[in-house]
Amino acid sequence: MEAVERIENPCGIRLRIFLQPKASRDQIVGLHDNELKIAITALPVDGAANAHLLKYLSKLFKVPKSSIVLEKGELQRHKQLFVPEPKLIPKEIEALL
């Protein structure tokens, strides 16, 4: 499985993410064991990290945060998300496609 995968039907991008909460800033770190490592500032408490991740990705891809689907890993650091019809693809992610 790839860290970033372009999906045709429905059109979008599937991300396999290793999430690092409690970071000093929000950023895409790079690849980590065939997953995209993303660091966020939120604490992993009561879904705050997931909400912050969705907000961060919605800004990067220029899509509404409600459209991003958390497919797997709600309570884990290893997550799988689907971003439907992104308006913009960040250069760090474009390089992995």
UniProtKB/Swiss-Prot annotation:
Q: What is this protein called?
A: UPF0235 protein APL_1380
Q: Which family does it belong to?
A: Belongs to the UPF0235 family.
Organism phylogeny: Bacteria, Pseudomonadati, Pseudomonadota, Gammaproteobacteria, Pasteurellales
Give the matching SUPFAM superfamilies: YggU-like
Which Cys-Cys disulfides exist here? none
Origin superkingdom: Bacteria
* InterPro entries in the record: DUF167, YggU-like_sf
> Do you know which SMART domains this protein is assigned to?
DUF167
> What are the GO cellular component annotations?
cytoplasm
Q: Known Pfam families for this protein?
A: DUF167
